[in-house]
Regions:
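Conserved anion-binding
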Residues: 4-93
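Alpha-helix-loop-beta-strand connector modules within alpha/beta enzyme cores
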Residues: 29-48, 97-124
Length: 163
């Protein structure tokens, strides 16, 4: 994305932009963007996968390996002002095998006052929503809805996600 595209997005009514791949080429993009639109309007996504005992960062929809360890990337990101961090476990994404609580805890301990949203593997039959509500500010779900495991209405009623 470039600033012209971002300007068009915000002029069209958006209040937040989601950034991932671009940061691997220009991490200072966050500062440039924040100076114009404010940190609260930035949502940073980290796509990660466990590889040889460590979590590593990926980009381009989880297809490109960055060779950057997750913990190193989190340390760098803590120097920037953005409102939300989305962590995606790409090995669990679309698998419905449950969220990765170990990964959530690892990230939660290392981010400075950012809203944390998790994506990857949610299954309403096995995940304890009360634990997730304590650890997360948001949860991204898709396949469980697509496969009709539940509806958003049922999710809302059953789990009362509102904090």
């Amino acid at each position: 994305k470039n600033f012209e595209q971002i300007r068009e997005i915000f002029e069209s009514g958006a209040d937040k932009i989601h950034i991932n791949s671009h940061l691997f080429n220009d991490l200072n993009f966050i500062k440039k963007f924040e100076n114009i639109y404010g940190g609260q309007s930035i949502s940073v996504e980290i796509q990660t996968k466990l590889f040889e005992g460590s979590y590593y960062c990926f980009y381009d929809r989880g297809r490109e390996f960055s060779s950057i360890k997750l913990l190193d990337w989190l340390k760098k990101l803590n120097d920037f002002n953005f409102g939300e961090l989305i962590i995606t476990d790409i090995e669990r994404d679309g698998m419905k095998n449950g969220v990765n609580l170990e990964l959530i805890d690892l990230v939660k301990q290392r981010i400075n006052q950012k809203n944390l949203v998790y994506s990857g593997g949610f299954n309403p039959e096995i995940d304890d929503i009360s634990i997730l509500k304590k650890k997360l500010d948001g949860l991204m779900i898709a396949l469980s809805l697509h496969d009709n495991l539940f509806s958003m209405k049922k999710f809302s009623e059953r789990f009362n996600w509102k904090k």
